[in-house]
């Protein structure tokens, strides 16, 4: 089975990153190779979710390739309206499949090179999912607990939740593990049908309304 596993308080004076027009975001997202901007050494991402606000602080030196990919995806709106489609209590919550199947499809093979594991997969730490060497694309998970067993498998955290971990704990977990092992959404169908499938068959899933970068 594919090993896909699978943040409002800021310092005074924090500034929003420059806004990218929606049409430019869509065009950029259709060309993964064009989204190669280097991320700042440290930055924060605010998720306005259906349950409340979650803030993730990213430190580029933890996992440079992962931090750069996350920065570019957030800046260009990839995670807006994305569902938390896999929520396994005590383990992790996973997200990162775009709700538009056309966009999702162009990112499926846009893998980045692996980063060394410099941090442990502790509670609140944020990591890209992977299906093997150099296969990280867009899917991300937040650890509910201390999942140190993932460290030796190449799962390299690039950030951590600094505000709103209590919100993460409240994300709907009623569907459990995904199909075929559980009664949750099938990742293949999410890729093929997008949010239409999730809204129809898994309407209780929480989601990211808007993701923004804050310095």
Predicted feature locations:
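Bacterial N-terminal signal peptides that target proteins for export
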Residues: 1-8, 15-18
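Cyclophilin-like peptidyl-prolyl cis-trans isomerases
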Residues: 13, 18-215
């Amino acid at each position: 089975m594919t090993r896909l596993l699978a943040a409002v308080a800021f310092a005074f004076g924090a500034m929003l990153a420059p806004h990218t027009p929606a049409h430019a975001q869509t065009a950029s997202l259709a060309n993964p190779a064009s989204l190669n901007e280097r991320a700042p050494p440290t930055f924060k991402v605010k998720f306005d979710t259906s349950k409340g606000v979650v803030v993730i602080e990213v430190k580029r030196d933890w996992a440079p390739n992962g931090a750069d990919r996350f920065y570019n995806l957030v800046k260009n709106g990839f995670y807006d309206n994305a569902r938390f489609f896999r929520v396994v209590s005590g383990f992790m919550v996973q997200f990162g499949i775009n709700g538009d199947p056309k966009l999702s499809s162009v990112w499926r093979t846009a893998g980045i090179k692996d980063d060394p594991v410099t941090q442990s997969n502790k509670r609140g730490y944020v990591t890209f999912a992977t299906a093997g060497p150099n296969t990280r694309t867009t899917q991300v998970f937040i650890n509910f607990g201390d999942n140190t067993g993932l460290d030796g498998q190449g799962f390299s955290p690039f950030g951590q939740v600094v505000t709103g971990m209590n919100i993460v704990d409240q994300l709907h977990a009623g569907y459990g593990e995904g199909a075929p092992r559980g009664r949750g959404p099938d990742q293949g169908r999410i890729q093929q049908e997008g949010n239409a499938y999730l809204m129809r068959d898994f309407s209780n899933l929480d989601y990211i309304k808007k993701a923004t970068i804050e310095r």
